[in-house]
Amino acid sequence: MNQRVIISTHLENELVSALSECEHDKLFVLTDTTTQEMCLPVLQKFYCMKEAKVITIPASDSHKDIESLMMVWKGLQEGGASRHSCMINLGGGMVTDLGGFAASTFKRGINFINIPTTLLAMVDASVGGKTGINFGGLKNEVGVFNDSKFVILDTEFLKTLDAENICSGYAEMLKHGLISTEAMWEELVSFDLANPDLKQLQRMVGDSVKVKERIVEQDPHEKSIRKALNLGHTFGHAFESWALKRKPILHGYAVAFGLIPELYLSVAKTGFPTEKMRQTVTFIKENYGTLNITCDDYDELIELMHHDKKNQNGIINFTMMGAIGDIRINQTASTEEIKEALDFFREG
């Protein structure tokens, strides 16, 4: 992995240091309409940011599209960006994904730094080099692998988040626990997410990022073990795309919902312990509620799964678990088994 991840203790000093290693003729900051208001003022106090040009795009994942991408390209072009410029992506996963893609493609690539401001972006989107946009009703359909030069994690930004966004990011942490150790999983399913202890959460963020870093370093382009990070995402991306046409849900909620049928399949096909599955499902249902799908939605959801980037030769590809930390990549399931898992999701 070519990016450096910094757990911030003094954001200004760390940003100055990062910028000194990213030589640039012009500096840009990408925000969305939410982080422009909530987070940008923190950076604008820093002397190193006094010349930075701000580009702002509409907030929410529904704007993670070609139109917003073109807005960023236009902002860079009109701001006089060259191949030697640098862009800071200040925001959640939508900003770091789209901003990373914009920076990777503008003039064949300029340097960029991610400063994630949501829990989801801290533990998932900003680390690992995946960039991209949604296209044709499908999640992250167009993009490239390209590392930011730095990721600066300042957990003070967690104080700007509402409960729903904390829950969204926490779903990826729960996934990291499942693919890591019993001790990490146990702490995660025991955590009081309704009344979070912020200091404990900040420590857990560091642990979660280390899980992803360790996996990405082994497999930067998702040829093998990095597929572990797709746990919950085959069903999850289908749920998210399905919801986009009705009532959109946050990515982390889709992943949490996706863990339920995928752990069900893990019990049925790879021997995951039923009790661990039940504990995880109970935690998810208590903290995330449910998604109101019916049997009539099954064919659409399965069709969406067939469009998943993880598939090979038209076969839906799953990551399953044999136990906590026992990862089984490149697993398959029949249409009948997928429908049984959806039945379990609905009826539990």
Name the predicted role of every residue range.
Residues 190-299:
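Active-site segments that bind and position negatively charged phosphate/pyrophosphate groups
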Residues 94-101, 122, 238:
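Short glycine/serine/threonine-rich phosphate/pyrophosphate-binding segments
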Residues 78-81, 147-150, 156-163, 171-183, ...:
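Generic secondary-structure signature for well-ordered alpha-helical cores
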Residues 1-86:
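ATP/NTP phosphate-donor binding region
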Residues 101-193:
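A glycine/threonine-rich phosphate-anchoring loop and its flanking beta-alpha core
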Residues 173, 274-348:
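C-terminal charged capping/lid subdomain of soluble metabolic enzymes
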Residues 76-90, 97-114:
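Non-catalytic interfacial helical region
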